[in-house]
């Protein structure tokens, strides 16, 4: 049961990291 929550947390963190990275890259592209 804890493994499911751990996997969900990992997926959420990965998605948040990707979203943050895309926002930073887009912000860096636009002066």
From Swiss-Prot:
GO terms for biological process: negative regulation of oxidative phosphorylation. The keyword Mitochondrion applies. It comes from the Eukaryota. Expressed in brain (at protein level). Expressed at lower levels in glioblastomas than in normal brain tissue (at protein level). The keyword Mitochondrion applies. Keywords: Mitochondrion, Pharmaceutical. InterPro entries: MP31. It is found in: Mitochondrion. Changing residue 12 to A: Abolishes interaction with LDHA and LDHB. Its main location: mitochondrion. One of its GO terms (molecular function) is L-lactate dehydrogenase inhibitor activity. GO terms for cellular component: mitochondrion. Interacts with lactate dehydrogenases LDHA and LDHB; interaction with mitochondrial LDH leads to inhibition of lactate dehydrogenase activity, preventing conversion of lactate to pyruvate. This is PTEN upstream open reading frame MP31. It comes from Homo sapiens (Human). The lineage of its organism: Eukaryota, Metazoa, Chordata, Craniata, Vertebrata.
